[in-house]
Amino acid sequence: MITRADALKLDAADILKHKRAEFSIPDGMIYLDGNSLGVLPKAAMARVKHAVDVEWGVDLITSWNKHGWFQKPLVIGNKIARLIGAPKDSVIVADSISVNMFKVLSAALAKNPSRKVIVSDSGNFPSDLYVAQGLNGFINNGHSLRVVEPEAVMDAITDDVAVVMLTETDYRSARRHDMKAVTDKAHATGALVIWDLAHSAGAVPGQLEEVNADFAVGCTYKYLNGGPGSPAFAYVHPRLQNEVMPALVGWWGHAAPFEFSQNYEPAAGIMRMQCGTQPVLSMQALDAAMDVWADVDMVDVYAKAQKMCALFVQLAEARCAKHNVQLFGPRDFSKRGSHVSLRHEQSYAVMQALISKRVIGDFRAPDMMRFGFAPLYNSYADVWDAVEVLRQVLDEKLWDVPQFRERKAVT
């Protein structure tokens, strides 16, 4: 069995170890929840302070030009594009994932007007399904949502399907879809594909251009470390950008927003996927957070993440075997994202006990503890130490107290 000394040797050889110093990690905390909210980059603190003190505090309205506020959605989008395998000027930062999903799904359905079926799976994040349900009701034109098990997606893509809407990395199991196989099958039947990259961006090597994906959305507050509620992104393949129109439009997506025309004329390219004025302070924090990735290769990031995931599972199953802790998700780590879910009948209480011991993960219903591994700031020693605390919590039944059973508003 691997020892803590072995974990420290892995850390010493880690080619990403220098990145940890760029983050503000609370002393004594093992933070394994970057799949839910990333750690604060030190550069983001300085950038936001400058944005408040100087750009807003002194330069005020001139900052739209002087400090490039107006251009930020595309500037940051191009930084994200490199990580998700997208070409230049195909990604825009705006709004939330749910709003962006509404925009790209409405655009995709309008592009395929004779077809009425949206295919998704039971592993998709529920908000995407809610958006599809709401949009179908809003359109009120006979559209339906076909939700199948992840393994049945390929068979569900038939010639009546307008859009296939999937999350690449399952938010619970970390199972990854084969993006190329799904996209190829959809295109062969005449359907368009939307990929939700919420648990992929900054976690796994991107491949949007490689697989010829039509649309994608993703968030920036998880592995990209943009901050709580940081704006999301939308991707549209260049061949579609000037052909599609989202149902939700606004002045920032206008071809000439400062001419204030009473009639909407879409901007060229990806710019039309914007709607309203962007949140500047959040944009500045995200811009600084993305600069942390400038010297990082996603292949290296994913390789480290998979090693950490495998080590975590190996240690947890060995040291917590008598407590019936079970892996939820694939054992083939090449087919996973960068988080691990463990099942236990008292998962919520166990997670609260872990948090009280400064090991931070989260809980997902009905019985899953999630642990996310962010290679820019997590270490192999973090993995070893976290499992040791998990063993202690289970062996000593530290979870078995009333306050750890009481569900909080956010789990």
Each model region followed by its residue ranges:
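Pyridoxal 5′-phosphate
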Residues: M1-T411
